[in-house]
């Protein structure tokens, strides 16, 4: 009996040799102290946008707005409006053209809408087109006009003939544009409504009633 008890004692696992277990947190402690609710993060304050740094000044009246809008539509239809073309780009296109060739483009000056680039005897140059009190005039000139295209027609027909033929983006013009130009030149802008035409043709003539 003593021998068996001794063997049993030798084969037994002592309490000290057992792996220690980490104490687990009691459920009572977690339930008794619930986690505090998270506070919502404050929304970042977005600064108000500064006034837009626009190229053009604000219109002084609704009539000025209508006149510039009408002028822009006519420019889109004329064929020699080159949009945001730079001064250098305009002069390069005019350099090999005959004297008097011109084009209209957007002005880079903050106080002007448009600029006139023309091939002079001394080379290409650009002139600002001012719009003041509802009228157009060239920089350095006192002659004013209700319409930008009346200004261009004036300098095309002037004795000094400052302007010649416009530089169009498309060299070959459609036949209907050429016919319209001839009709306007023969009848006159003020008499277009008297021509016995159907409304479609009359609207087409009045869409660009100039001789340029």
UniProtKB/Swiss-Prot annotation:
One of its GO terms (cellular component) is cytoplasmic vesicle. Residues 174-183 are annotated as: Interaction with Elongin BC complex. Residues 1-57 are annotated as: Disordered. Residues 162-211 form the SOCS box domain. It holds the Pfam family SH2. Residues 56-67 are annotated as: Kinase inhibitory region (KIR). Residues 80-175 form the SH2 domain. The keyword ATP-binding does not apply. Keywords: Cytoplasmic vesicle, Growth regulation, Nucleus, SH2 domain, Signal transduction inhibitor, Ubl conjugation pathway. One of its GO terms (molecular function) is kinase inhibitor activity. It is found in: Nucleus; Cytoplasmic vesicle. It comes from the Eukaryota. The keyword Nucleus applies. The ESS and SH2 domains are required for JAK phosphotyrosine binding. Further interaction with the KIR domain is necessary for signal and kinase inhibition. The SOCS box domain mediates the interaction with the Elongin BC complex, an adapter module in different E3 ubiquitin ligase complexes. The Elongin BC complex binding domain is also known as BC-box with the consensus [APST]-L-x(3)-C-x(3)-[AILV] and is part of the SOCS box. Belongs to the SOCS1 family. Interacts with multiple activated proteins of the tyrosine kinase signaling pathway including JAK family kinases, TEC, KIT, GRB2 and VAV. Binding to JAKs is mediated through the KIR and SH2 domain to a phosphorylated tyrosine residue within the JAK JH1 domain. Binds the SH3 domain of GRB2 via diproline determinants in the N-terminus, and the N-terminal regulatory domain of VAV. Interacts with the Elongin BC complex (ELOB and ELOC). Component of an ECS CBC(SOCS1) E3 ubiquitin-protein ligase complex which contains Elongin BC, CUL5, RBX1 and SOCS1. This is Suppressor of cytokine signaling 1. It comes from Rattus norvegicus (Rat). The gene is Socs1.
């Amino acid at each position: 009996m003593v021998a068996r008890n001794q063997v049993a004692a030798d084969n037994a696992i002592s309490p000290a040799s057992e792996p220690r277990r980490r104490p687990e947190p009691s459920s009572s402690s977690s339930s008794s102290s619930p986690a505090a609710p998270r506070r919502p993060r404050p929304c970042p304050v977005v600064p108000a946008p500064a006034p837009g740094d626009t190229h053009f000044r604000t219109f002084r009246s609704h009539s000025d707005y209508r006149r510039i809008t009408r002028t822009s539509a006519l420019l889109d239809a004329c064929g020699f409006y080159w949009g945001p073309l730079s001064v250098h780009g305009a002069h390069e296109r005019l350099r090999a053209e005959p004297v008097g060739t011109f084009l209209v483009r957007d002005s880079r000056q903050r106080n002007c809408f448009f600029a006139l680039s023309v091939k002079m005897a001394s080379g290409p140059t650009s002139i600002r087109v001012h719009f003041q009190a509802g009228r157009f005039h060239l920089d350095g000139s006192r002659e004013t006009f209700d319409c930008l295209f009346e200004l261009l027609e004036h300098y095309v027909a002037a004795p000094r003939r400052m302007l010649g033929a416009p530089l169009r983006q498309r060299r070959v013009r459609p036949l209907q544009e050429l016919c319209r130009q001839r009709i306007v030149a023969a009848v006159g802008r003020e008499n277009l409504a008297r021509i016995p035409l159907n409304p479609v043709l009359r609207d087409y003539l009045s869409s660009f009633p100039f001789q340029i």
